[in-house]
Amino acid sequence: NTDSIFDVQVKRLHEYKRQQLNALNIIAQYNYLKANPNADFVPKTYIFAAKAAPGYYMAKQIIKLIWNISQELKKDKKLNEKLNVIFLEDYNVSLSEILMPAANISEQISLAGTEASGTGNMKLMINGAITLGTLDGANVEIHEQVGDDNIIIFGMNVDEVNACKSGYKPMDIYNSNAVVKQAIDTLQYGINGQQFNEIADSLKNSDPYMALKDFDSYQKAQAYASECYKDQTKWQKMSLANIAGAGIFSADRSVEDYARDIWGLSK
């Protein structure tokens, strides 16, 4: 559906980058639309592209999950017009040159305090995508450049993550949040004929990157993004603010700073 929001998460597949949080939210949206087929739902196409390290079993399971979600959605044509998932194989620079200009939402959802920096969010920003993310890595600098109104921030900050770690019990969230419980149970019942018990068990029993803790906030951020997109004048202003604010991330500015501040050189 070319009229849908293109919600893009393209990066290395790792649990700290939390593609599993994105997938869990898609499952929750799928469950909602199955129960409410006539709901007023802004159509969304979730686009993933990622590679996992050869020996990283859980990352490969998450790729398998995303692909099976995409196949399950295709079984219901009416629902698939509202909710679609695409996993692009063999992600590389050439593919990113096509994908990044097409993105409406840039998913930068790592657990706060885990991302060193990264440049993918900057590339999406300069192409006009709106960042939906945590206060982690270069998202902090993007936030400083575009302001509160032109970025969608959710989840815990670093201090809140550190305060929560010692007593974190994801099973408590599973038992108290009906939407989370149904989504995780769906992993165990099966998606496109495949069960994902190991992902479900990890989320319920350890959840090392606190996907369940940030789930409610993430859902609200997604809902807010959909509401913003309905107002195309507002959305285009947000997009232009991101393009205009991206200049600080240019290589020229970075080299100038190094030459002046580190190497003591003048023009």
Please give the residue ranges for each predicted region.
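Hydrophobic beta-strand segments of well-ordered beta-sheets in folded domains
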Residues: 44-46, 105, 131
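A near-ubiquitous, low-amplitude feature marking generic local secondary-structure context
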Residues: 3, 9, 49, 56, ...
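Catalytic binding pocket for nucleotide-activated donors in carbohydrate/polymer assembly enzymes
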Residues: 101-102, 109-239, 243-248, 253, ...
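Long, K/E/R/D-enriched contiguous segments that form extended
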Residues: 1-96, 111
